[in-house]
């Protein structure tokens, strides 16, 4: 093997396999674009995003790490969320949870 060389196995990688997901419609009611990152606790996103907020407690976007979804002003789109894993404790973000889910 050459230093830095990748040995990639054939096949697909399935993200978040076996975790509960939720599909919902989200609308940007504001006048500015809003971008939400892959690991942001969706329950705590910008208040200008309109959706069933209580249903999203303990969930994040079901997209690849390091990516984001952008909502343009007036735009409505379907997104898929996935349950947070690990210890299921949330601190920071908008400060709406600050502890166990």
Swiss-Prot record:
SUPFAM superfamilies with a match to the protein in the record: Urease, beta-subunit (SSF51278)
The enzyme's E.C. designation: 3.5.1.5
GO biological process, one term: urea catabolic process
SS bond partners: none
Reaction equation(s) it catalyzes: urea + 2 H2O + H(+) = hydrogencarbonate + 2 NH4(+)
Record key words, sorted: Cytoplasm, Hydrolase
A Gene Ontology molecular function term of the record: urease activity
Enzyme class, spelled out: hydrolase
GO cellular component: urease complex
Family matches, as Pfam families: Urease_beta
Compartments reported by the entry: Cytoplasm
CDD domains given in the database record: Urease_beta (cd00407)
UniProt pathway annotation: Nitrogen metabolism; urea degradation; CO(2) and NH(3) from urea (urease route): step 1/1
Oligomeric and partner information: Heterotrimer of UreA (gamma), UreB (beta) and UreC (alpha) subunits. Three heterotrimers associate to form the active enzyme.
Family (UniProt): Belongs to the urease beta subunit family.
Record's protein name: Urease subunit beta
């Amino acid at each position: 093997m050459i230093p830095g060389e990748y040995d990639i196995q054939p096949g697909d990688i399935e993200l978040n396999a076996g975790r509960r997901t939720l599909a919902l419609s989200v609308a940007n009611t504001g006048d500015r674009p809003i971008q939400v990152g892959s690991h942001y606790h969706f329950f705590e996103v910008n208040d200008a995003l309109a959706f069933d907020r209580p249903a999203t407690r303990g969930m994040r976007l079901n997209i690849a790490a390091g990516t984001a979804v952008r909502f343009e002003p007036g735009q409505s789109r379907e997104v898929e969320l996935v349950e947070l894993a690990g210890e299921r404790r949330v601190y920071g973000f908008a400060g709406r949870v600050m502890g166990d889910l």
